[in-house]
Amino acid sequence: MQKDQQKLEQLIKGKKVAFIGAGVSHKTLIKEFVELGAHVTLCDQKKSVEDFGDYAATIRELGIDLSLGENYLDGFKGQDIIMRTPGFVGYFEKPLQDAMAAGTMVTSEVELFFDFCPCPIVAVTGSDGKTTTTTLIAKFFEAAGRKVHLGGNIGAALLPMLPEVSPDDVAVVELSSFQLISMHSSPNVAVVTNVTPNHLDHHKDMQELSLIHI
């Protein structure tokens, strides 16, 4: 096991971790976190475990606690770590802010990858053209003979790839404004395509949106 994966295990083992939603990337991470010794709570607006369809069997098998329905954010209380998704727009709302004030670590799959990734990271953000730019940069590195790990807002979840990442590789990551809200680690190279007034229904104003991208 690489030392970066060991550091991740040290962060997770024995901790109470709440996941907001069970999207594709979170399903992979939930299993990994349980295997690393975390006590996982899944917070979701669904009303019962049966509403998760085929994933209900995995929830039972892994022994995941559930905080469901209208008050699903109550599951934040008493957690050591909260794993948010890019689609969760309640970052500045009271439940999450109260959790952070109580000392809970709020992070995401891509943020943890930034924290523990041993190779250089090229990050691409902006309002338009992110996916095209990210894809082209990845192709350039591949043509130069580098092993590329492509992810973020494009491709697969990056954190489960961590054991396969070596210092000689390069990670090319697409980031949305929602993913940037709580980012505290910087990439080695940052690319901003442009910033236009998108998603102002989820950001306070254009100034906040612009500052997030810087």
Language model: regions and residue ranges:
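Phosphate-binding loop of NTP-binding sites
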Residues: 74-77, 86-212
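N-terminal leader/targeting and accessory segments in enzymes
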Residues: 1-108, 112
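Accessible peptide chain termini
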Residues: 1, 212-214
